């Protein structure tokens, strides 16, 4: 019997949500803190599955840290160089792409013998473009099951030099190379093949590397230059900003059924590109106010939009369900990389939107949504994908309830999401 949660129709949303730490920032910061010289105290760390997988891996690799009882403050003792496994190891990383990709690169420094593996879905998430680039730099990597996919056996050997990486599937491959390159013996020049997707996520990586004392130069995101033989240095304390992708659900809820909702922990100074989601809501007709460490959204008459959302792929999913409440159709374009996330998000989104009555055209890299006159009650499959569960909670902002199957899958980034949503919701 699969777990389910039925959300009753909501009349109004109003209030403030303090966001959990960003997943993208948390796992990058943990890895850099481990590689750095000195001790780093990370605050507002995300407590979630993905971060737990990174912490477990670092511990197995001999990194010592102290985690607070609420798991949101972590004091990491850096090793001041590459991570070295004292014996052959197998690390299980669940379905955490933000742990798998950066660790796959970092463990190619020196001479390790480490296997990285994960859940069945992880073995369907491509990593070939990263492996190709690491091999160009001298890394010894074997595929243990299917070519181009985890599990991987890593035996060190990455020295740097000239490498080319395909940027068209995931920016995490470039992120992994960037974070590893400063510790290589030689300087590294990373050439990007194809169109670089999700560029703002690269800015998060460069910001964090700078925070830990390493500068990267690039020629308009086409070629990146990183000096070798560097050392990351702990900044001492680092505050992880709130998760901008997680903010999207609350901001969209306010746009549909506000009141006014304020999310704190992100704002106009945020390093995350997903804060641009607020601009999309504004284009659709919502009212947005920006503070240094908050974004506020109030209800407006929403209109459908047609937009390239390659720069905000995770938050763009929220637009697909917000579109159910807009006047006219919505088209979200250039989102092929939805297909290689926690699930094939394009197929999943199309299937579930049709269940609630929308007319949907699913293309190779776009989705076109025509909202129904009235939403239908449905059981929503979540595909073990945290974002599917959170996106479809918005259906309850109508006069129709919605049932979310396996609601606990939000644990990947936001374990108490449904409690937070209930806290700002007034039932019809």
Swiss-Prot record:
Subcellular localization: Cytoplasm
Protein task: Catalyzes the transfer of the enolpyruvyl moiety of phosphoenolpyruvate (PEP) to the 5-hydroxyl of shikimate-3-phosphate (S3P) to produce enolpyruvyl shikimate-3-phosphate and inorganic phosphate.
Taxonomic source organism: Serratia proteamaculans (strain 568)
Short name of any one Pfam family annotated for the protein: EPSP_synthase
Protein name, entry field: 3-phosphoshikimate 1-carboxyvinyltransferase
Keyword Ion transport attached: no
Record's subunit section: Monomer.
SUPFAM superfamilies: EPT/RTPC-like
This protein's record includes keyword ATP-binding: no
NCBIfam families: aroA (TIGR01356)
Protein family (similarity comment): Belongs to the EPSP synthase family.
Domain of life of the source: Bacteria
GO BP terms: amino acid biosynthetic process; aromatic amino acid family biosynthetic process; chorismate biosynthetic process
Enzyme Commission code: 2.5.1.19
Binding sites annotated in the UniProt record for phosphoenolpyruvate: 23, 97, 125, 172, 345, 387, 412
Gene: aroA
Alphabetical UniProt keywords: Amino-acid biosynthesis, Aromatic amino acid biosynthesis, Cytoplasm, Transferase
């Amino acid at each position: 019997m699969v777990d389910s949660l039925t959300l009753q129709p909501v009349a109004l949303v109003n209030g403030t949500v303090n966001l959990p730490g960003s997943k993208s920032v948390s796992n990058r910061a943990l890895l850099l803190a481990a590689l750095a010289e000195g001790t780093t105290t990370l605050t507002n760390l995300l407590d979630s599955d993905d971060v737990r997988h990174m912490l477990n891996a670092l511990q197995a690799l001999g990194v010592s840290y102290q985690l607070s009882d609420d798991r949101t403050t972590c004091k990491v003792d850096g090793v001041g160089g590459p991570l070295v496994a004292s014996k052959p190891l197998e690390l299980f990383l669940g379905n955490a792409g933000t742990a798998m990709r950066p660790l796959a690169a970092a463990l190619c420094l020196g001479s390790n013998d480490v296997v990285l593996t994960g859940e069945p879905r992880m073995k369907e998430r491509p990593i070939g473009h990263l492996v190709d680039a690491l091999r160009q730099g001298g890394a010894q990597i074997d595929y243990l099951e299917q070519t181009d996919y985890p599990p991987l056996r890593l035996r060190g050997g990455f020295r740097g030099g000239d490498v080319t990486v395909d940027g068209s599937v995931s920016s995490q491959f470039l992120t992994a190379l960037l974070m590893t390159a400063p510790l290589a013996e030689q300087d590294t020049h990373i050439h990007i093949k194809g169109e670089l997707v999700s560029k703002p996520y690269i800015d998060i990586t460069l910001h964090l590397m700078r925070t830990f004392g390493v500068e990267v130069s690039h020629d308009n995101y086409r070629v990146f230059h990183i000096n070798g033989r560097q050392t990351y240095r702990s900044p001492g304390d680092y505050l992880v900003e709130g998760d901008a992708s997680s903010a999207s659900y609350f901001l969209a809820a306010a746009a549909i059924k506000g009141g006014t909702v304020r999310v704190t922990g992100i704002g106009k100074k945020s390093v995350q590109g997903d804060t641009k989601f607020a601009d999309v809501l504004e284009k659709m007709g919502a009212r947005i106010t920006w503070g240094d460490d908050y974004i506020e959204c109030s209800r407006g008459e929403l209109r459908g939009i047609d937009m390239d959302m390659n720069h905000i792929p995770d938050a763009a999913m929220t637009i697909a369900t917000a579109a159910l409440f807009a006047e006219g159709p919505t088209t979200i374009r250039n989102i092929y990389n939805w297909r290689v996330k926690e699930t094939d998000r394009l197929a999943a989104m199309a299937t579930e939107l049709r269940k609630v009555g929308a007319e949907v055209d699913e293309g190779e890299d776009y989705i076109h949504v025509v909202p129904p006159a009235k939403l239908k009650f449905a059981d929503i499959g979540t595909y073990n994908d945290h974002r599917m569960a959170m996106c479809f909670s918005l259906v309850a902002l109508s006069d129709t309830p919605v049932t979310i199957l396996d609601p606990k899958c939000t644990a990947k980034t936001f374990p108490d999401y449904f409690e937070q949503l209930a806290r700002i919701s007034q039932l019809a």
